[in-house]
């Protein structure tokens, strides 16, 4: 939340990934959080829906995967955001933004690194 309000940071976008919750839940939550914070200028890009190294059944059985499922996302506090995620995939967004600003982008990954790993694999 502090980063969203910081004048020192130039946030370029938000990517989501499956982690403690499904990527769908992470995406609707990110959209709602940005709306509450008054940051509708930031686009949200849906990311990886599975970890790279585990099967779905293994992942769902872990402590952090206990809430992860194919169920539709639950309604965030205050309802769903008025907008939706961008059609561009998170991995492609990361590749595009880093290539557009070489040496200037710092990725602040606060969840699983799956999107970053997939972007590195592709480039």
Model-flagged regions — what are they?
Residues 1-123:
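N-terminal acidic, glycine/proline-rich low-complexity segments
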């Amino acid at each position: 939340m502090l980063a969203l309000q910081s004048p020192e940071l130039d946030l370029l976008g938000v990517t989501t990934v499956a982690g403690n919750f499904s990527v769908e839940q992470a995406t609707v939550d990110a959209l709602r959080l940005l709306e509450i914070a008054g940051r509708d200028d930031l686009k949200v890009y849906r990311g990886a829906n599975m970890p790279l190294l585990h099967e779905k059944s293994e992942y769902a059985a872990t402590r952090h995967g206990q809430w992860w499922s194919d169920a539709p996302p639950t309604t965030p506090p205050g309802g769903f955001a008025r907008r939706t995620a961008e059609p561009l995939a998170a991995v492609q967004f990361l590749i595009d933004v880093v290539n557009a600003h070489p040496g200037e982008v710092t990725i602040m990954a606060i969840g699983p690194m799956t999107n970053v790993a997939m972007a590195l694999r592709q480039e």
